[in-house]
Amino acid sequence: MASSFLPAGAITGDSGGELSSGDDSGEVEFPHSPEIEETSCLAELFEKAAAHLQGLIQVASREQLLYLYARYKQVKVGNCNTPKPSFFDFEGKQKWEAWKALGDSSPSQAMQEYIAVVKKLDPGWNPQIPEKKGKEANTGFGGPVISSLYHEETIREEDKNIFDYCRENNIDHITKAIKSKNVDVNVKDEEGRALLHWACDRGHKELVTVLLQHRADINCQDNEGQTALHYASACEFLDIVELLLQSGADPTLRDQDGCLPEEVTGCKTVSLVLQRHTTGKA
């Protein structure tokens, strides 16, 4: 999904120059470019900062996470190029607006600002020390962390509804509730979002599978006309997009803004998968 933010030839050293006729060594020597070297070092430091952030999520404020999210997208994707989300009135719009507000900000500036905030969150951070491997470091900020951007308030067990359990990915509770018929698998919240919408938004693939097994309406639309496929696409969960398509989701359904699922994502791979599936059914 990421678009290159390095100048052409920055990785290979190719400056576009030609070998002079007097050089018979057979090896091309390119002029040393401090600018390219500086950009490469900045990009490397940015990637280290993104990896380090995974251990700082709990200490970062909501505003800081939004700030970091926007700059991560600016570096990896470029200028905001997706329609304003309508599937998630609060969180989705805030994330989109934070990214959109950067306008034509350069990737270099975005990387510098991102690194500065990570350093502020952890003044003792040493980029030279490798990050610990494992579950915490498996996802780059801006990937699966997109929807889990905020720390949600702790809700007492007795105050939880079925959507709270869905957000928590409590498969056992949801399965029992559906099997006992205490809850309709297609029940909707006040915004018209079904459990399947929520599971797709949060990236809970196993829960998505369970809901589909219990005959969740795969093409159910919320109050804005968006399907679960719109949600999975917008959040860039490729594996869930593929699961939905394999299970019969309709990629040709448009929301109230006239957008197809392929048009609400910033991920080229997700968009291509949806386009190919649509073409194959035509």
Swiss-Prot record:
Keyword Membrane tagged: no
Keyword Mitochondrion set for record: no
SMART domains with a match to the protein in the record: ANK (SM00248)
Binding site for an acyl-CoA: 69-73, 95, 114
UniProt feature coiled coil, ranges: none
Domain of life according to the entry: Eukaryota
Keyword annotations of the record: ANK repeat, Autism spectrum disorder, Cytoplasm, Disease variant, Dystonia, Intellectual disability, Lipid-binding, Nucleus, Parkinsonism, Phosphoprotein, Repeat
Listed SUPFAM superfamilies: Acyl-CoA binding protein, Ankyrin repeat
List of residues that carry Phosphoserine: 106
Tissue: Detected in placenta and spleen (at protein level). Detected in placenta, umbilical cord blood, CD34-positive hematopoietic progenitor cells and bone marrow.
ANK repeat residues: 191-220, 224-253
PROSITE patterns (alphabetical): ACB_2, ANK_REP_REGION, ANK_REPEAT
GO cellular component, one term: cytoplasm
Positions of region (Disordered): 1-31
Predominant cellular place of this UniProt entry's protein: cytoplasm
Function: Binds long-chain acyl-coenzyme A molecules with a strong preference for unsaturated C18:1-CoA, lower affinity for unsaturated C20:4-CoA, and very weak affinity for saturated C16:0-CoA. Does not bind fatty acids. Plays a role in protein N-myristoylation.
Recorded disease: Neurodevelopmental disorder with progressive movement abnormalities: An autosomal recessive, progressive disorder characterized by global developmental delay, intellectual disability, significant expressive language impairment, behavioral abnormalities, and movement disorders including dystonia, spasticity and cerebellar ataxia associated with gait impairment. Additional features include facial dysmorphism, oculomotor anomalies, microcephaly, seizures and brain imaging abnormalities. Parkinsonism may develop in older patients.
Protein name per the record: Acyl-CoA-binding domain-containing protein 6
Organism in which the protein naturally occurs: Homo sapiens (Human)
